[in-house]
Amino acid sequence: MSSKDNTCPPPGPGHINGFHVPHYAFFFPHMLGGMSXTGGLPGVQHQPPLSGYSTPSPATIETQSTSSEEIVPSPPTPPPLPRIYKPCFVCQDKSSGYHYGVSACEGCKGFFRRSIQKNMVYTCHRDKNCIINKVTRNRCQYCRLQKCFEVGMSKESVRNDRNKKKKESPKPEAIESYILSPETQDLIEKVQKAHQETFPALCQLGKYTTSFSSEQRVSLDIDLWDKFSELSTKCIIKTVEFAKQLPGFTTLTIADQITLLKSACLDILILRICTRYTPDQDTMTFSDGLTLNRTQMHNAGFGPLTDLVFAFANQPVPLEMDDAETGLLSAICLICGDRQDLEQPDKVDKLQEPLLEALKIYVRTRRPQKPHMFPKMLMKITDLRTVSAKGAERVITLKMEIPGAMPLIQEMLENSEGLDTLGGGASSDAPVTPVAPGSCSPSLSPSSTHSSPSTHSP
């Protein structure tokens, strides 16, 4: 039998792969490209046979007639007109759209979202009626948040937005793996080292007590006040040294370094002294070993702030924190883009992000059975700010009650010039004495060298 006998006859002109053309030609026009000219539809010009199927270009429209085929280009689609929004209702900057119920810029949208999600508590240092515009919006967070509420921004919109995102992108219920990357491990070690070098642990101290004002509360014991003033001054110096060792801190502008140090000084002082709390004795120990009970802390100058500080110290979270966690939480308190008057808040936020991630992974690795410990630690920042706001009020009261020169802690909280010598100055191991309002404190310069290891903070 010849090879011709083994070859199947080609399908008829009215068939394509076994299907009758009239039934499918209009549903599968691309199949027509493989047909011969004699088997096509009448009046329609066809392309030569191609290997496989050919698809008409989407850029053309085929207009069929009984005599010819015309190729007409598609008219171009005009681009949509850009939407124009009213200026930001909060600061009058250029709006990026409607956010949380009102026309707002990206800056005010992000500020409002962070404030609500983190339950931030702000304080106005003026009359609670600051002008908020594009230029002044970062100067007073309290008034900026109030302006957000006044123009109609909604808390519920922030919460609903978070819930909506959770529903739209559900995460698998598989257990997350918290493995420290080399970069995160290195960051934790650097922060822990910075903390330990500037704040010795309670077990390293030789504790001693004093009989001054140990039994009865008085308005102020001058001897204890003098001692506390000396120790708080050393604490501030050590806080500056701690900040200088944090990765990226010295890359910020000098003005932002000053702002962050002044804003977080009292937060860190309170957090640190609370980690030296001994619950069974109800005492706190300073870095030179001085141990004071609740009554003595009151008489040393804490006054009505005393019970707030002891209540914070007696919570489970501060009692369970180790050096790495205390250091990371202190760094997060310090490097915070929500502080007022920052020149580069976005850069500060970017420096804070790896610290937050490091704390989260470290806490969950250390306590796999307590998944809520990390958010509880972050909530302590809000508590700290509440206590430190009361502390700032107490400092102002003490300034009026005690005549003469101010200790450094009062200068930092009261006088905007207290840290303005950051660009240069003496070494921080130089003797520090109380300074008068309006003078500078070269010992606090983050650009200066480290102080000697023998000087400890409270």
From Swiss-Prot:
One GO molecular-function entry: zinc ion binding
Segments of skewed composition (Polar residues): 52-69
The name this protein goes by in its record: Retinoic acid receptor alpha
Residue ranges, annotated region (Modulating): 1-87
Primary residence: nucleus
Bilayer-spanning residue ranges: none
Ranges for region Hinge: 154-182
Short motif (9aaTAD): ranges: 407-415
Organism whose genome encodes this protein: Xenopus laevis (African clawed frog)
Organism lineage: Eukaryota, Metazoa, Chordata, Craniata, Vertebrata
Record function comment: Receptor for retinoic acid. Retinoic acid receptors bind as heterodimers to their target response elements in response to their ligands, all-trans or 9-cis retinoic acid, and regulate gene expression in various biological processes. The rar/rxr heterodimers bind to the retinoic acid response elements (RARE) composed of tandem 5'-AGGTCA-3' sites known as DR1-DR5. Required for primary neurogenesis and for anteroposterior neural patterning.
Keywords, sorted A to Z: DNA-binding, Metal-binding, Nucleus, Receptor, Transcription, Transcription regulation, Zinc, Zinc-finger
Entry annotated with the keyword Transcription: yes
Biological-process GO terms, alphabetical: cellular response to corticotropin-releasing hormone stimulus; central nervous system neuron axonogenesis; DNA-templated transcription; positive regulation of neurogenesis; regulation of transcription by RNA polymerase II; retinoic acid receptor signaling pathway
Domain called NR LBD: residue spans: 183-417
Classification via SMART domains: HOLI, ZnF_C4
Family: Belongs to the nuclear hormone receptor family. NR1 subfamily.
Annotated gene: rara
